[in-house]
């Protein structure tokens, strides 16, 4: 009896830990491609409710069209091969904006080594991407200025 209580208590603690981070935890069943879980953090970030994330198609269709084909194909091929992976893409918000996401994926395999499920975390990397874009812009400005300088 005590072991069951401890297990329930541990489970509640782990759930609280997962749901109190800024990262968005998720799990997809590989055979059905349905979400077994997605953290409540998804709604404040993207505007879509937890309940609206039913399957992998919901994930793919809420991705920027320019990122979709590569991202989906990359994730499928890595997952089929049983390889953990990371990918950056732009996710559609409910109000038709975009947020840069880094998806970190761990492939869970059964005793035969076959892919059973995918678990991972989504991270909002929008600020990092804005900083990268600004650095690229500044670098181009510096290059342009260096060609205008009569000393070079």
Predicted segments, located by residue:
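Short, ordered coil/turn segments that flank beta-strands lining enzyme active or ligand-binding pockets
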Residues: 30-31, 94, 111, 126
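PAS-family sensory domain signal
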Residues: 9-59
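PAS-associated C-terminal cap
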Residues: 1-13, 66, 123-140
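Conserved metal-coordinating catalytic motifs of nucleotidyl cyclase and c-di-GMP turnover enzymes
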Residues: 39, 96, 149-152
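PAS-associated C-terminal
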Residues: 28, 121-123
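Conserved nucleotide-binding and Mg2+-coordinating catalytic segments in signaling enzymes
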Residues: 140-152
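PAS-family sensory domains
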Residues: 48-111, 115-118
